[in-house]
């Protein structure tokens, strides 16, 4: 059925737009919330009388979109991602990634309005995306993807498992063994001498 929107409805249209929607959607959602009215000669006449007012609101939106476009295109966005030595990312930069970055910069833009040229980004470097703002106004933003280098933690001595002893450690062990053998030989020799003297 045809309806006229009383105000802007997300994903549907703007105030004054005539839309063809399912009857259930109109009766169960739009009409109870006063978001739309049935399209007939009376409602058409009413919105015709408000045409200038509605057009003034749209003109203000166009102006806001132009200002937002300028701000977005002046941005310098840097995204750090885990990557290999050849610059290939271990993951990918998606529209969700850009949406999160814009949120951090206090830009409240719907994710569905962001479009990455090439769908996703899987390498470091400078890339571009389109942000659809209002009507035919879009912003082209550039963003740089850089490799995120993980810091190596120093390995503690207690964490070194299965480590082969150093040469100086090996020499020390051999020296201790030789000294122990020498002491044992001296003790045996002394015991033999005592036994002979008793005989």
From Swiss-Prot:
It comes from the Bacteria. The keyword RNA-binding applies. Residues 153-199 are annotated as: Disordered. GO terms for molecular function: rRNA binding; structural constituent of ribosome. Pfam families: Ribosomal_L9_C (PF03948), Ribosomal_L9_N (PF01281). Keywords: Ribonucleoprotein, Ribosomal protein, RNA-binding, rRNA-binding. InterPro entries: Ribosomal_bL9 (IPR000244), Ribosomal_bL9/RNase_H1_N (IPR009027), Ribosomal_bL9_bac/chp (IPR020594), Ribosomal_bL9_C (IPR020069), Ribosomal_bL9_C_sf (IPR036791), Ribosomal_bL9_N (IPR020070), Ribosomal_bL9_N_sf (IPR036935). GO terms for biological process: translation. The keyword Ribonucleoprotein applies. GO terms for cellular component: ribonucleoprotein complex; ribosome. Belongs to the bacterial ribosomal protein bL9 family. NCBIfam families: L9. Binds to the 23S rRNA. This is Large ribosomal subunit protein bL9. The lineage of its organism: Bacteria, Pseudomonadati, Spirochaetota, Spirochaetia, Spirochaetales. The gene is rplI.
